A protein has these predicted regions:
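CBM-like carbohydrate-recognition segments
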Residues: 6-10, 21-54, 66-78, 82-108, ...
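Long, well-ordered core segments of solenoidal/helical folds
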Residues: 20-39, 74-92, 125-144, 184-210, ...
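Asp-box/WD-like beta-propeller blade repeats and closely related beta-sheet repeat scaffolds
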Residues: 122-162, 509, 516-541
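Oxyanion-binding "anion nests"
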Residues: 238-287, 291
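Acidic Gly/Asp/Thr-rich repetitive segments characteristic of extracellular carbohydrate-active
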Residues: 407-454
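Extracellular beta-strand-rich solenoid/capping regions of secreted or surface-exposed proteins
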Residues: 442-450, 462-478, 486-504, 510-527, ...
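Right-handed parallel beta-helix
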Residues: 474, 479, 499-510, 525-538, ...
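Structural detector of coil-to-beta-strand junctions
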Residues: 493, 520, 543, 565-566, ...
Length: 786
């Protein structure tokens, strides 16, 4: 993501597309109220290393990852750079204070380091410096962190969030391999011991704090417990759980322990909520008591923890209706529309603590004595996180408009239309077909850094020695510049994880020579991808799989002849691809002679960690041609959103089912039992190639075909799902002709593509699998290289 500065220059002048969702609206509102981040939390421009600002800015960065808000990233970065110098020295930070609150704000420096790398080394230095505090943080005899040096022997629930998400993320990123298990065990112990020591058996809740010494005036001299369960303290506990679980390995014994604790909250907290609004009280264990009030920050913390727990699978779907009902109730109760277009969060407790100079004794009257304010950072941050969960779950999207900006190239369409590629950068000329990484090779140019465009002075086959991974952003590969027959990549896969990549007029024909099980081409965890006029075939897994990515277009490609009974460990696996993502366009592509997955639409189990927030949403599948599938054409799409518009489906000699089913809206227990949502319009089903008998002599039944058409009409969504750049579609028969004329590396089609196009047009298959005997669906590239 080192390209953020470049994107900033492009996008800050742009208008917006669509209505801003609540997460973005709250960020905009906060930035309007606070000209820079030193004004957040009522600081009035005063610099302070404080957890409240760090918490809110962390949520800003998370929203920026979903919605691409470079000006917001700069807002965060300005504060981060103000608070720490290039040596990583933090303004007025003293390790000797051993204040766990001072650990929390360092989390944003992980994200900034990911974005800017070693361009600014302060980000890594800050996290290293804060990590040193944990090593010597004083602890109770049972191993929990003291809350502060000035609060000796005290464990506050607040401290769970202040220290443990940072501790867990640092351990995952940088912890010594041989120590990780024990470090994660220590993190889990902080929760389990802290929960045991703060638990109130009378209510099933957890008290705000515990004093191991039993000497503080605010604690019970027998138990060491404070007087009440405070709403926000319990909220800190809840969100600490879901944040730490992001980093704790699933096979670590502590993972199940923390999931159990989260589910315990779901079991007990609803009993203490207001029965009418569903929200929680400032003094959590005294709902409805005179003077007590429904408090926003604790309520949104619980809602965020439950929403995230539901998405991550920590919480059973049986609780889905209850959890999904909470967020709208919160909006109704606590979010106010302001006359200037901003929004505000009401009824936030300004602060809550125990002891100290204020002699805070933690009784009911104390908690009610603290000021009630609006837009408290401690509520705004969790509100943005909860909103992101809600927006991703309901496919609520928003895009900065790129109208007026240069497009990738003439003819670029769809959501990847504005990919920058290597524009304005260095030209690398490929002069050798070798794959040793030396200057003049494709690998050397791909692995270079900075904006770059790759052209070719040679033609022929590049036999990869290992996968070609495109990790560095701002890259254009122009296969059409090669002389003669062009460029074909063989033996290993090409895999893209970089933003702003354009690939045009290449052939990827994997084959079995290397004995690898792989896709020929794939992409994950990237944005602004454009794949144009490529020919992709002979893969031993899927030919081409694109999902878990965003703002992309795959257009005018041929995806053909995935090898079926080949080297795949599962056996027959001649699959076209898995396609999905968020705000992506697949148009004018040809699928031919693939046994299944033409394509398979994605499902949620293909996404991990927080990818569903950023990389899953609307998919457009428009004006594509699918020919001679074996088992299935399109299927899947569980829990997704798809526009399937004016495609052309042509069963061939290997197609088993001729009853008009070209889209199987399927579910399974291993993926999800919730069907995807589809807008289905204008698709064609052409039986002319099999009218006199297809696979095993089967003939199409027109009544079944008609019934299938009625089914698609009935299950279709009434409106097309929105994307940033909707495709201008054409009628399916016209698209069919255009695809056959122009798809693939068509500037100079090779014999393979020419044969494929001829077979699609004639409704035939010249070759068959040498093992399976399926017409057109081959088992080895040698089945056609005769």
């Amino acid at each position: 993501m080192k390209q953020l500065l470049f994107i900033l220059a492009m996008l800050t002048v742009a208008t917006v597309y669509g209505q801003e969702p609540y997460s973005v609206r709250m960020i905009r509102s906060e930035m309007q109220r606070n000209p820079d981040a030193t004004h957040l939390d009522g600081r009035g421009g005063e610099r302070k290393w404080n957890y409240t600002t760090g918490l809110e800015l962390k949520s800003f960065l998370d929203a920026s990852r979903r919605y691409e808000l470079p000006e917001v990233v700069e807002y965060v970065r300005a504060w981060a750079d103000t608070m720490a110098n290039e040596k990583g020295e933090i303004y007025k930070y003293k390790k000797s204070n051993y204040n766990v609150d001072h650990i929390c704000p360092a989390r944003i420096y992980f994200d900034l380091h990911d974005m800017y790398g070693d361009q600014d080394k302060r980000y890594r230095r800050v996290t290293r410096k804060i990590r040193e505090q944990i090593d010597s943080q004083p602890r109770t005899q049972s191993g929990e962190f003291w809350h502060k040096q000035i609060y000796p022997h005290q464990v506050w629930l607040d401290g769970f969030y202040m220290a443990l998400p940072f501790y867990a993320e640092y351990t995952k990123r940088y912890g010594p391999k041989e120590q990780k298990d024990s470090l994660f065990a220590d993190i889990v112990h902080q929760f389990t011991a802290g929960a045991e020591n703060t638990f109130d058996p009378a209510t099933g809740l957890f008290r705000h704090a515990w004093d191991e010494s039993r000497s503080m005036f605010w604690c019970d001299p027998q138990t060491g417990l404070s007087a009440h369960a405070w709403g926000r303290a319990t909220g800190w506990y809840a969100i600490a759980l879901v944040e730490v679980l992001d980093y704790l390995p699933k096979d670590h014994p502590g993972h199940a322990v923390l999931v159990e604790q989260l589910n315990y909250f779901l079991q007990v907290l609803p009993k203490w909520a207001d029965p009418e609004t569903g929200m929680w009280y400032q003094v959590l264990d005294c709902p409805g008591r005179e003077g007590n009030y429904q408090e926003a920050t604790c309520s949104i913390m619980f809602i965020y923890a439950f929403l995230k727990g539901l998405r991550m699978g920590y919480i059973d779907r049986a609780h889905e209706d209850y959890i999904l009902g909470l967020y709208p109730k919160f909006i109704d109760r606590f979010i106010r529309e302001n006359a200037d277009g901003t929004i505000s969060m009401t009824d936030c407790c300004a602060v809550g603590g125990l002891g100290g100079k204020q002699m805070r004794k933690g009784d009911f009257d104390y908690y009610l004595s603290e000021p009630i304010i609006e837009n408290d950072c401690k509520g705004v941050g969790p509100f943005i996180w909860a909103s992101l969960e809600w927006e991703a779950r309901h496919n609520i999207d928003w895009f900065p408009s790129r109208e007026g900006l240069p497009i990738a190239f003439e003819g670029a369409e769809g959501c990847g239309k504005y990919s920058v590629g290597g524009r304005g950068g260095k030209e690398y000329v490929v002069t050798s077909l070798a794959d040793d990484g030396s200057e003049g090779t494709l690998r050397h140019a791909v692995e270079a850094e900075g904006p770059r465009t790759i052209t070719f002075d040679v033609s022929g086959d590049i036999h990869l020695r290992e996968p070609l991974n495109i990790r560095n952003p701002y890259l254009t590969i122009l296969g059409q510049t090669a002389p003669g027959k062009g460029i074909t990549i063989r033996d290993h896969n090409v895999f893209i994880t970089a933003d702003h990549v354009i690939i045009r007029y290449l052939r990827m024909r994997l084959g079995t020579a290397a004995g690898v099980e792989a896709d020929a081409l794939g992409a994950r965890h990237c944005r602004h991808l454009m794949i144009d006029h490529c020919s992709i075939s002979w893969a031993t897994d899927e030919n081409a799989s694109f999902y878990n990515f965003a703002d992309a277009t795959i257009q005018w490609c041929i995806i053909s002849e995935a090898l079926n009974a080949s080297v795949h460990h599962k056996g027959r696996h001649g699959y076209g691809g898995i396609w999905g993502g968020r705000n992506v366009s697949f148009h004018h592509n040809l699928f031919a002679h693939n046994n299944s997955r033409n394509p398979r639409f994605d499902h949620p189990k293909l996404y991990w960690d927080n990818d569903l927030l950023h990389y899953r949403g609307t998919v457009e599948f428009v004006n594509n041609v699918v020919y001679n599938w074996g088992m299935k054409a399109i299927y899947g799409g569980e829990e997704g959103w798809f526009n399937v518009i004016k495609n052309y489906f042509r069963p061939g000699p290997a197609t088993r089912n001729l009853d008009g089913e070209w889209l199987d809206i399927s579910t399974s227990e291993t993926t999800s039992m919730i069907k995807g949502r589809f807008y289905i319009h204008g698709n064609s089903y052409d039986i002319s190639a099999v009218e006199d008998g297809g696979f095993e002599g089967r003939k199409p039944e027109k009544l079944k075909i008609a019934n299938q058409g009625h089914y698609y009409y009935n299950v279709s969504e009434p409106k097309r799902f929105e994307v940033s750049v909707p495709l201008l579609d054409e009628h399916a028969p016209y698209a069919y002709e255009a695809v056959l004329k122009h798809a693939g590396a068509s500037h100079r089609r090779d014999a393979i593509d020419r044969r494929i196009i001829k077979e699609v047009r004639k409704g035939t298959a010249r070759y068959k699998g040498s093992i399976t005997g399926l017409p057109g669906i081959i088992d080895s590239e040698n089945d056609v290289l005769k």
